[in-house]
Amino acid sequence: MGDLHLRPRQRLNGITPDGQPVTQRFSDLLLAAAAHLDERWWADGTLEFNPETNRSVRSVMRARYSPGPFRTMSVAYRFARAQSEQVELAWQWPIYGTPVTSRGANSNSCGGAWYSAGRVQYSLRDKRLTDSVAGFEYDAGCWVMRFGIERLSTGRAETNTRIMLQLELVGLSQLGSNALKVLRDNVPGYRRLSSDRSPSSDFTP
């Protein structure tokens, strides 16, 4: 299944300061498309196109693979003419231990499983890492611990870095910095580890 949207803008008319009529052609066209290829694969993209120069102005293309719960990986390409050109890798994946959802009758016991989640952007123009988030999550069944590092570029040679630590008592409360929100905002398809045990489900399509 897929969708395609095309949004042209209106033609504008005006008068120059010396009284001469002027007609501005159509401004950029915005195209957007998304496709759910099968149960595991998604793809989407947007393109801003200038009909006067017959060149793209901005574009984003992304493909995502999600074979199961708490398993997602995506790659993206971002382009802004004369400004930036980036590639991006984002993920959420189990790395060690038995997930709570696989323990059957013992799913309420406090065992442990480790997950990694994050997003890394690389500038093809500057040949360096730009914005990035990397984190680890430990799901003990009755509580979840999140640890992460967020790095934001504020200039070609300047960055801001912060460390996040959060403890979630499943079904009760969360303590510490909001690492959950940062991961949810940065990782396409990210799913909260306790979503099947909490009153609210946090799934990002």
Functional labels for PLM-detected ranges:
Residues 1-205:
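Long, low-hydrophobicity, solvent-exposed regions enriched in small/turn-prone and acidic residues
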